[in-house]
Amino acid sequence: MTAQAVSPFAHLSDADVEQLGKEFDAIHQEVYNDLGERDRQYIRTVIKMQRQLAVAGRVLLLASKNKPAWAAGTACLALAKILENMEIGHNVLHGQWDWMNDPYIHSSTWDWDTASTAEAWKHSHNYIHHTFTNILGKDKDLGYEIMRIDPNQEWRPGYLLQPLYNLLLMAFFEWGVAVHDMDVEAIRAGEKPWADVWHDIKGISGKARDQIIKDYAGWPGISALATVALERITGKVRSANALRDSALGGFTGAMRANFTANIIRNVWAHSIIFCGHFPDQTYTFTEDEVKNETRGGWYLRQLVGAANITGGPLFHLISGNLGYQVEHHLYPDMPSSRYAEIAPRVRDICERYDLPYNAGPLSKQLGMVHRTIARLAFPGGRRKPKPGPYRGGLRPVKPTKRPGQLSGTAA
């Protein structure tokens, strides 16, 4: 039995949907007409700041035998990795900055500090996820093929372990993302040509090799050499055995720091991304429900299939502006720095058309996500109540009864 939710836009006529689509298109065009130097300065400043944090972290980790230096270096490195993946890499690969015609800050040339190849990410995320957002059986991000996060998904015994899968995915998120585009279900069904599978394997193995060498051999090796050089210069260590021990300490200290920074980045990215589509407020769809979908209908699906996270400017920066997940799904190619600017206009459209605007603090959204994952590990599950139309101040009214049905994310 499927869990059903009252459609949040069943009250809209075809003319309403068409007009709504035109209004959303107009916002996009107005922003693009206004892009200029302040936008260029923004992304270049963020990239510069990220590099400075990375350099500071690496320098501090040259003294990784010292605990305060190790902690500070690890923190700088973790923050640098978060910025690189969330606000820079993800958004550059969306083509948000292609309008600059900068050969370096461009979706066709950018590579990022994570295990996933840019090519695989652009296919699984930019194309599959953003095209088929929240469509059951089409959007592979709904549970990442290992978890049941919607009561409309058929239960299988393997889902009993999904709370454990979730913890492992949280810690090693970059590796889960790296293999995501493999499309395991298509391979099992024999629908994916082996030439494509082999191409994916080569891409994953090559990127994995580079990441492992960089984080767990290259930088630790540099730290070990720097430790030995410093102690030789200062004359603190004279014997060969002592130098060897110092080198080993520098190597392992840097390696532990890189591992810790990667885990911190993975947990943060997992938390922000899962809060984008899995909280109670969001809707899922069947393929039949989106047949003959118009441009306005696409906007509506993106609007109610996503959920925002409220927070201040610093939070939005380190979350890659994915606290504005609604705006990001409406305009994935718009510079992320503009989402806060257009959010009031999106809310205004929601209010005028009696549509929900999904948002909540991180603690609330994340709590709902983990509760849903735990509950739907078992058979059954019913949808949670959905918010009603937006009515200013991020306070939706109570749901109203309307005809029409849509699938509902629930626990």
Set out the residue ranges of the language-model regions.
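A beta-strand-loop signature enriched in Asp, Gly, Thr, and Trp
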Residues: Q281-N292
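Alpha-helical bilayer-embedded segments of polytopic membrane proteins, i.e.
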Residues: R40-N85, L160-W175, K202-S271, L406-G408
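Non-transmembrane, extramembrane segments of multi-pass ion/lipid transporters
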Residues: I27-D34, V184-A195, T284
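Membrane-embedded catalytic scaffold of the fatty acid hydroxylase/desaturase
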Residues: L79-I204, V290-R382
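C-terminal, active-site-flanking charged/polar segments
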Residues: F259-F274, F278-P279, V346-P356, A374
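Low-complexity, highly charged intrinsically disordered N-terminal segments
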Residues: M1-A56
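Flexible loop/turn segments at secondary-structure boundaries
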Residues: P68, N266, H270, H277-Y283, ...
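Intrinsic disorder at enzyme termini
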Residues: K386-A411
